[in-house]
Amino acid sequence: MLRSFSGAGKCKCRIPVSRQPVCGRSLRISSTLTPWNQSRRAASTVTSLDSFPNVGEKLHGFTVQEKKHVPELHLTAVRLKHDKTDADYLHVAREDKNNVFGIGFKTNPPDATGVPHILEHTTLCGSEKYPIRDPFFKMLPRSLSNFMNAFTSADHTTYPFATTNRQDFQNLLSVYLDATLHPLLKEEDFRQEGWRLGPEDPRSILTQGEQSKGNLQSEDVVFKGVVYNEMKGQISDANYLYYIKYRESICPSLNNSGGDPQYITDLTHQQLVDFSKRNYHPSNAKILTYGDMPLSVHLKQIGEVLDGFEKGQADTDVKLPLDLSRGPLNVTVPGPIDTFASEDKQYKTSTSWYMGDTTDVVETFSVGILSSLLLDGYGSPMYRALIEGGLGSSFTPNTGLDSSGRVPIFSVGLTGVSEADAPKVKSTIKRVFEESLSSGFNDEKVQGFLHQLELALRHKTANFGIGVMEKTLSSWFNGSNPMKELSWNEVIDEFKKKYEQGGYLESLMQKYLMNDNCLTFTMVGTPSYNKDLDDQEMVRKEKKLSELVERHGSVEQAVSALAEEELQLLKIQEEAQNADLSCLPSLRVEDISREKERKPVRESKMDDIDVVWREAPTNGLTYFQALNSFEELPDDLRLLLPLFNDCIMRLGTGDKTMEQWEDLIKLKTGGITTSTLHTSSPTELGKFREGLQFSGYALDNNIPDMLQILTTLVTETDFTSPHAPAMIQELLRMTTNGALDAVAGSGHRYALNAAAAGLSRSFWVQEQQSGLAQLQATANLLRDAESSPERLAELIDKLRLIQSFAISKGSGLRVRMVCEPSSASQNEIVLQKWLAGLPRNRSPTSPLDHTSVNSVANRVFYDLPYKVYYSGLAMQTVPFIDPSSAPLSVLSQLLTHKYLHPEIREKGGAYGAGASNGPIKGFFAFTSYRDPNPVNSLKVFQNSGIFARDRAWSDRELAEAKLGIFQGLDAPMSVDEEGARYFMSGVTHEMDQRWREQVLDVTAKDVNEVAQKFLVEGSRQSICLLGEKKDWADSDDWEVRKLSMNASGEPVIDPLSQDGAVASA
């Protein structure tokens, strides 16, 4: 998996968005040192410093270098080095049963062929101890892990997992260590995962006979490979493309680790093997373990593997960015057109400065605060000057402080900029610097950020260990001490000391930003960009074919040879599906408890409002959630709910600007959110609730303030202020700008939502709230608002109407509180008072109109400028309490691992494919992701029912499917999520317990029967594809649609009509 383009350790771009108000063989002990007495461990707690060996002591071939207790994070960290290989090791002990392992290697890419990324994939395709094909994916259903992945970052590659089961941990540890240190790296795996040339549909050769190979033409040959198609998908995301081209410009010595499709096809198998030998060695590794398992157990198992190696050469080369000390640099590159932006605003431009050295942990923390002060929130000076000032529509993806490398880089930029305004962006940024330096920074804002850090330390998350790994690895690989990264209080205290002396943040600004030593990077939307990529790919293909023709003598023989290679790969893939997997370790279904852990809640009534309480250890925090559901909401108002949520966190009230509200939110809360609500009934198919939900958390004593802030923002946001119309248009631009990139990142989900919209009104409503229909409606709103003051006024009137009933006392309101038992009584008093002050208004209603659902086409193709495809197929099934629900979930796991993965990913080259059962929503789904051949994938989807019905499922296969379900079902839960399932959907503990038992008791016969009933006989199916339209989309009854500011032909709701009528955009 390619690491997110923002990079580990990256302070992500702080774009003010809706619902976001703020923003690791034998025991060898030297006789000259005191052996570590393991018996001391048994009498101590997990994090007691005395329970760990002292500095200089040895254990299982490792020597302790540092150890430290970090009370604010309730952990103890021990840093060790493996004596024989010099492998670095960090153990983080914490009272957390969700244990984590990670091993990473420094992998500076030598070029842009993506060798680190392709190696990450092929490393997981078989090893010496586990010589089966693809043990990584084979382990997914043999484990109860709640996190299992691999990441290629800019300069290192990491293989992490997390699980609460200790035997599972040791199983996965064995597989991960052997995969990374003893990979097979077979050439056929390189061809499957990396790249190859071959006939687009080799299955046709099998169906038409061997003689058909001679009929293949050069046009039938295409580039294939999982990573190749993944990266084609990545560059379809203009945000990713902008970021990666920016990184190539500012740090040209650090090549594209993910791989540029233009260069991936230059990589050879031998180059991959050589890169692995150089880099995947313990001497070049960083290892991290986290959790409550004993350190000695880890060291024994890991040490036995590392002792099989001799000391090698570590890659300590830290790639540095360009030298900017001689003055400014400017780089301009072409990019794709954003069809959701105006034709005259196709520029993306940013300017970047260096901010010191990340090994200075305190200063890096301090410049992070400085970055937040300049960029966070609607009231930030950069937002006001750049976006509110009308120069662009949103921040560029590199905006913020990037501390993933040795040199922190601070960038500010805008998308949706006109050619004339592009030069003004930098000058405006510099003006903001000058004004901020002159006026200084408001102490209240700094205290607000520090308060947020205090709450972050108190907040108990389920994935804390993975967060520790992500926080430490990037800087560790670039020379920082990970122990310092974990010392939160020391860093904060040192910052406070410097800050209290006065002028500290301003001095950092003067030191790093008040100069012209910067790089300005600009991407210009070019109409021919995507066609140019296609042409370049064709040239590369012709060059490869010419080389093959020289070798084979003719085009026909060259293409026939490629077909033969493809058939050989297909044969290997087919054989792998029936391989003996007995060498792989596995948990058993018997390891799963039949009893669901009970998280008791209590219910009360206050003023006729249902309140659900969950009392649990929360470190002095109280979490609040309220749902306000609306019955039969008019369609035109529904489409405006997301925009209403945006407005609540943007417009401000009569007596306070949004900047003032943001400061108060940071000082008094951990954040408040508003969002749309859509939940399904577990007992009745198609029954659902929609509306708005509100949530937040704060220290117990700040809950009254938090509730007051929330209520005031919802009920008193000033839609009538002179600034409101411009702000609303600004919000619409932010949503539409980059909408295509948002879809590309989760294209399979958007395709599935659009497909499901034709199944029932519930799914149709969901699509209107959060799917492609919502994106197009938003674009239409922007178009109308910019062209017609009258339409903008109508929009504001409807937003004010929503405000009148958004949060009100009535049958639709429900509340959930999570707090310490000792805080419950005081919170009851506070809540009672808050409820008493709410207005009592009902939402307007309209008769249910099912024509909108019935008119949705069963086969929809969205013509979008992507180089790969995303597909979704949906069918309605049964509610959660139906006996068929559990076997349908087992069926989805079986199809994913035993049919769809080998057919669509391994053979078809898609990055991903799977089946899923939505037990609460009552639908069964198929999806593919970054898929080069969606037509074939749809055939596989449609053949799945017969495959599952006719297969004699083994006990082992059933057990694996059940383990896969319980990975999610029994995954650790953050304290604020406890009780949420019952509160949101009405799923009781007894319902969950019954479903759990039904899953555990599913038989092969049950699976065959639900496959026949729902997939073969089945009810109505709906399909949606996203991607570049090809000739085949003109047939097969596809309804072709577009998404853009000027889309036409698809039926959309007009949110500004009087009755929410369906119209043509």
UniProtKB/Swiss-Prot annotation:
Gene3D superfamilies: Metalloenzyme, LuxS/M16 peptidase-like (3.30.830.10). GO terms for cellular component: mitochondrial intermembrane space; mitochondrial matrix. Its cofactor is Zn(2+). Zn(2+) binds at residues 117, 121, 230. It is found in: Mitochondrion intermembrane space; Mitochondrion matrix. GO terms for molecular function: ATP-dependent peptidase activity; metalloendopeptidase activity; zinc ion binding. Binds 1 zinc ion per subunit. Its main location: mitochondrion. Keywords: Hydrolase, Metal-binding, Metalloprotease, Mitochondrion, Protease, Transit peptide, Zinc. This is Presequence protease, mitochondrial. Residues 1-42 form a transit peptide. Its EC number is 3.4.24.-. The active site is at 120 (proton acceptor), 193. Signal peptide: none annotated. Monomer and homodimer; homodimerization is induced by binding of the substrate. GO terms for biological process: mitochondrial protein processing; protein processing; proteolysis involved in protein catabolic process. Degrades mitochondrial transit peptides after their cleavage in the intermembrane space or in the matrix, and presequence peptides; clearance of these peptides is required to keep the presequence processing machinery running. Preferentially cleaves the N-terminal side of paired basic amino acid residues. Also degrades other unstructured peptides. May function as an ATP-dependent peptidase as opposed to a metalloendopeptidase. PANTHER family: PRESEQUENCE PROTEASE, PRESEQUENCE PROTEASE, MITOCHONDRIAL. SMART domains: M16C_associated. Belongs to the peptidase M16 family. PreP subfamily.
